[in-house]
C-alpha cells in the first residue's frame, strides 16, 4: 500500500478494517472463553477468569505498546526509502522479542499470586484464578513474537495477513474451549490451555510468512542478532508506549479492587461487560494503528501537511465508527448480556457497566489517535506521560475521593468516561503545540 501518495480516506479505511476486524475477531474468541466458562463451568469459574482480567491487561498492553516501536521504526525507514537497514531492523526486532517474551513469562509467574491477592480476589475463586493465570503466562513468549511479527508486516501496509492468521488460531481456540471445558471438564484450566495453543499457532503462521519472504523483510534464524543502534530506535518509541499500556492497566487493577468489594456477581458482570468495551475500543485502536503507521512513513518523507490530514481523518473515523457499534450494543444490551450468563444479578451489574462505560467508548479515539500521531513523528514520551496522568493518577484520585464519598458501583464506573475526557483534552493540547513546532522546523529547512 502506497501511504505517501494519493487519497488518504480510502487507504486509511482499507488499512484499518482488517485491523479492527482482527481485534474484534480476537475479542470474539476471548468472549467465547468467557461464555464457555460462564455457561458450562459456573459463575465461580467466570469470576475467577474475571479476576485475572486486570493482570492479563498489564502484560497484554505492555506487549502491544512495545510493538508500536517496531511498527513506527520500520515505517519510518520505508518512508525514507532506506532499504539497506530494514532487514537488520527486522532481525533486531524478533531477537529482542524472543528475549522479552521469556523475561515476561518469568516475571508473570513470580508476581501472579501477589497481584491477585493484592487486588482483593475473593478466597472462593483465588485458587482457580491462580491456576488460570499461570497456564495463561506459558503463552506470553508466543504472544510477544506474534505481536512483533505483526508489527513488521503492518509496517509495509499488509493488515490482511495477520487477520487471516487470527481467524485460524481463533477458530482453533473456540474448538479447544468446547473440547476441554465441556468434553474433558477442565474448567478454567481448559480455557487457559486453549489460549496458549492458539497463541503458538498464530506465532508459527506469522514467523513462517516472514521466513518465506526473499526481500528486505525476510527472516532467517541464523541471522538472529541485535543491532544496538536499531534497537535504540525501536525502544525510544516502544518503551514509553509499553510503559503507558502497562501502567494504564495498573489503574484497572485498582478499579478491579473496587469491583471486588461488591462480590462475585459484580466481578462476573463487570467481566462480561468488558468484552463489549473491547469490541468498541478495537475500532478506535485500529485507526490509532493506522495513524502511527501512515504518520511514520509521511513524517519520514517530510510531508507534514499529509500528517495533519491523517490525524483528522483517523479521529473522525475512529470516533464515529466506535460510537456506531456502541449504540448497537446499548440498544440490544439485554440480549447481548444474556449470551454470557443466566444469572439476573450478574446481568444487572453487566448492564450498569455497559450504560456507564461502553456507551461513550468513542472518546478513547481522542487520546489514542492523537498519541499515535505524536509517536509517528518520533514523540513518544509526552503522550505516555499524559496518558499516565489521565488514566492512572486521575483515576486514583477519583477512587480515593469521589468513590469513597459515594461508594456505589455506578460511581465507580463513572471514572472511565471522566478520565477519557481529561486525557483526550490534554493530548490535543500537546499534539497541536508539537505540530506547530514541527511546521516551523520544516519551514526552516
Give the ranges of each region predicted by the language model:
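Short alpha-helical transmembrane segments in multi-pass integral membrane proteins
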Residues: 1-16, 74-141, 183-239, 295-360, ...
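Residue-level signal for short hydrophobic patches within transmembrane helices
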Residues: 5, 9-28, 32, 55-62, ...
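Transmembrane helical elements of multi-pass membrane transporters/channels
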Residues: 14-33, 135, 146, 169, ...
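Helix-terminus/linker motif at the lipid-water interface of multi-pass membrane proteins
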Residues: 28-47, 116-123, 179-186, 246-273, ...
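Small-residue hotspots at the loop-to-helix junctions and early N-terminal turns
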Residues: 41-54, 129, 133, 192, ...
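Small-residue-rich hydrophobic transmembrane alpha-helices
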Residues: 46-106, 143-162, 269-333, 364-387
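Hydrophobic transmembrane alpha-helices of multi-pass small-molecule transporters
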Residues: 58-61, 173-177, 203-207, 279-282, ...
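Short runs within selected transmembrane alpha-helices of multi-pass transporters and secretion channels
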Residues: 67, 136-154, 162-173, 191-206, ...
